[in-house]
């Protein structure tokens, strides 16, 4: 590196980390042919605006593939070109997404890889069809082992992109070691290396030999450092350098960009020395396997050279200044990019997934119930099986990736099943997700719902959903998915009443009614503008059907006076039939129809959700839209009155509840 006298605050020097690298630059002879075919394939999906497509083409990701796969057959090189284009379509679009949206995107791509011969559904984000057609062509020139390793490593790559988005959403800056651990997947090298095996059948004990594992890691780390050295200037200009080792080294080492460059250059030199000292040290197996191993390691070394050559030959990082930078290696620090340029590369029609949470907001909007499912127990169901069935059904019906769930709130009538957490754990662990907070609450179903909502709205939220499971064997169970941008929004105002303990069954009815009026009174003091005269139903968590409609009894406009009897309990003017029925004309009974299907539900932990499910299925979505609904929850004299608002279309939930 040049002397420090030449360094200034507005320019920096990129060291030549491969000056003594023994692999020379080479290019696949089918480069031009593959470039034309792959570019046409990528462009037909309209992933970018016309202006951005032109810039995308100047980056020439086909050149990167043709440098990396210089010695491979033309058909494999074409697949490599398609892969590089797919990588950078993913990179450009997910950089503008929040973590939840990236996870939705990832689910589509993974599904496409597993169904390469099945056209994607109409209206789905285009990335699904891009990934499907890529892999449909890719499997034609890759053997079974290479195919398996590609799908495994590409899936890992995609999940790491979600992690990167989570870091971005939380403005998280990792230390260098933690960053390298994540970046080894986000750089996409592992699936790229799978193409080197296109005609090989390396046994797992050879492929995962400790030395070959280290050679792969050292090669990947050199790719990371080389890429970040060249991409830093563009990324710092966009304010997107939180996932770049130069920025992280500056923070960790408390230095400026020049000090960080020295730090990273030394890291690269150490890695190169390790690779060159060990790449010929693999033990011997069979002549065929030895030949494959030698060719594979040669491919790793060539990849390091290819990435460096492409970085200084395409317009990706240095645009029209690429030849000067290649010769001199001095880079002028770019000023911050205008905000309207940060997403201009993506046309509005191609911003395929709407972000769930805008990073500029302090907390997510419209937090509530995103999805809902219920289950009626049979005589053969035990509670653990019932819980797994219901949660699994929710995930399946709404096509929810278990990895996108970060919290479980379990509400049960009695804390009689301490192993329910372990039963539910398997539904997530089988998908590779053991990073799930799990909390058990007894009796009061709204506690789980409020806890889940508070988590989503807190600084601890990591961008994933929460699931609230509630119920018991006698009344039925439910599972609710809680997250932002929900069609059923739980309003923040709550009225809570902590009454006297219930000593007997005879006291329960009076305590229930007293708690209803007291909690509603507290609610109105906090939210006086709320009115039940809007025509919306009122849902009550009712221990029996004899409690009837809470619209009656002067329970309008906060009139809770004149209803207490000599025992201090609130009496009702009975206007309720002896049983609930779907034919009743009172809208209040719509919320209690499900009670009839499950028998006379006691103070079951899941009855609020079962009543809500009844409301959604029995009232047309267009009628419910925009309505505010009062909800009352009660458990052993502890009660809460709160409101929910139907902020979106409930038709999907309605359809799935009836499925």
From Swiss-Prot:
Cofactor dependency: Mg(2+)
Which family is this protein grouped under? Belongs to the terpene synthase family.
Task: Please tell me whether the keyword Zinc-finger is annotated for this protein.
Answer: no
Q: What does this protein do?
A: Terpene cyclase that catalyzes the cyclization of farnesyl diphosphate (FPP) to delta(6)-protoilludene.
Per UniProt, where does Mg(2+) 3 bind? Answer: 227, 231, 235
InterPro entries documented for this protein: HMG_CoA_synth_N, Isoprenoid_synthase_dom_sf, Terpene_cyclase-like_2, Thiolase-like
- Which UniProt keywords are listed? Lyase, Magnesium, Metal-binding
What does the entry list as the binding residues for (2E,6E)-farnesyl diphosphate?
316-317
Binding positions (Mg(2+) 1): 91
User: What is said about the domains?
Assistant: The DDXXD motif is important for the catalytic activity, presumably through binding to Mg(2+).
Site positions per UniProt: Plays a critical role in the stabilization of intermediate cation: 88
Name of the protein this chain belongs to: Delta(6)-protoilludene synthase
Name the Gene3D superfamilies on file.
Answer: 3.40.47.10, Farnesyl Diphosphate Synthase
Q: Which reaction does it catalyse?
A: (2E,6E)-farnesyl diphosphate = Delta(6)-protoilludene + diphosphate
Composition bias, kind Polar residues: at what positions?
530-573
Any one GO molecular-function label of the UniProt entry: metal ion binding
The segments labelled Disordered in the record are: 528-586
Q: What's its EC?
A: 4.2.3.135
Please list the GO biological process terms of this entry: isoprenoid biosynthetic process
Q: Where is this motif: DDXXD motif?
A: 91-95
